[in-house]
């Protein structure tokens, strides 16, 4: 039996509609417009695409979008000054510094200079610690999007066995913590995990976030399990013509879909949820900053 496809594109549209509804209410009832500031250093083509998309969706949700584009040779002091100015700006409720930064800039230093309350990426060490102790925090966008889709599909996740493949600070570790906070029994697997196929076969939920194209085959998946594929990998596609490529996840989609009960596709699965959750975090931050009731269903 073919797996149910978890349509991240459709679910992200639903989340963005919820965000827009809350933004309208905040404007009408309190005269406040949530604002998201994005800082881009340099001219990395992929980063430019992401920043444009974030700005477009921010405006479509009714929020203010502030873009700060800096030269690739911008000094650390100048970048810190921009972040400090945004920290102090009451019209800015979310701050995102687009990664990666040029090599001469200390990413950890820059990220930890952001006001934790405005850290809508959820990367500040204070937010990492709050999430790790089960307290209110800003939650990283990609893991939050995965959690939302899992909750939508399953309802309660309590008691389920979950395996997260990947231990990055951006996805793997916070994803595991979110699942633990939802009362899953969680295993974090990685490149050194012994008997990885057997570990994965015991999971009701598999989150693949390792960055290796089609690493997880269908025979690793427990029948009926839910597979969340975070990977976005570009591989050669000679069947499309010379020099052509295609996007694949960390899971071999066709074989996993034959065994799984539900699966996210690549593209169109986790990816669209990341920006939707960035908008959700910005609204949440705005509400917290102004002592307003937080919107339900838009955070962990």
Curated annotation (Swiss-Prot):
NADP(+) binds at residues 166-168, 191, 232. PANTHER family: C-1-TETRAHYDROFOLATE SYNTHASE, CYTOPLASMIC (PTHR48099:SF5), C-1-TETRAHYDROFOLATE SYNTHASE, CYTOPLASMIC-RELATED (PTHR48099). Pathway: One-carbon metabolism; tetrahydrofolate interconversion. One of its GO terms (cellular component) is cytosol. Catalyzes the oxidation of 5,10-methylenetetrahydrofolate to 5,10-methenyltetrahydrofolate and then the hydrolysis of 5,10-methenyltetrahydrofolate to 10-formyltetrahydrofolate. The keyword Oxidoreductase applies. Its EC number is 1.5.1.5, 3.5.4.9. Keywords: Amino-acid biosynthesis, Histidine biosynthesis, Hydrolase, Methionine biosynthesis, Multifunctional enzyme, NADP, One-carbon metabolism, Oxidoreductase, Purine biosynthesis. It catalyses: (6R)-5,10-methylene-5,6,7,8-tetrahydrofolate + NADP(+) = (6R)-5,10-methenyltetrahydrofolate + NADPH; (6R)-5,10-methenyltetrahydrofolate + H2O = (6R)-10-formyltetrahydrofolate + H(+). Homodimer. This is Bifunctional protein FolD 2. One of its GO terms (molecular function) is methenyltetrahydrofolate cyclohydrolase activity. The gene is folD2.
């Amino acid at each position: 039996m073919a797996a149910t496809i978890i349509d991240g594109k459709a679910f992200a549209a639903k989340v963005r509609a919820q965000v827009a509804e809350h933004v309208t209410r905040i404007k009408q009832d309190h005269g406040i417009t949530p604002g998201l500031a994005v800082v881009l250093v340099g001219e990395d083509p992929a980063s430019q695409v992401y920043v444009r998309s974030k700005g477009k969706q921010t405006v479509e949700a009714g929020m203010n979008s502030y873009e700060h584009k800096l030269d690739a040779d911008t000094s650390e002091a100048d970048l810190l000054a921009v972040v400090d100015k945004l920290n102090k700006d009451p019209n800015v409720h979310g701050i995102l510094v687009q990664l990666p930064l040029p090599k001469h800039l200390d990413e950890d230093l820059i990220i930890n200079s952001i006001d934790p309350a405005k850290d809508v990426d959820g990367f500040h060490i204070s937010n990492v610690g709050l999430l790790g102790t089960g307290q209110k925090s800003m939650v990283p966008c990609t893991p939050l999007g995965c959690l939302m889709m899992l909750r939508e599909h399953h309802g309660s996740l309590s008691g389920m066995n979950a395996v997260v493949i990947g231990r990055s600070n951006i996805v793997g570790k916070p994803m595991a913590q979110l699942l633990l906070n939802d009362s899953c029994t969680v295993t974090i697997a990685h490149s050194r995990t012994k008997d990885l196929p057997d570990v994965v076969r015991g999971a009701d939920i598999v989150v693949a976030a390792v960055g290796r194209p089609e690493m997880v085959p269908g025979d690793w998946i427990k029948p009926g399990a839910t597979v969340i594929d975070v990977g976005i990998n570009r591989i050669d596609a000679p069947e499309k013509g010379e020099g052509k490529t295609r996007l694949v996840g960390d899971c071999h989609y066709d074989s996993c879909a034959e065994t799984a009960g539900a699966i996210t596709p690549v593209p169109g699965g986790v990816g669209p949820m990341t920006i939707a959750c960035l908008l959700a975090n910005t609204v949440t931050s705005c509400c917290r900053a102004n002592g307003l009731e937080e919107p339900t269903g838009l955070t962990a």
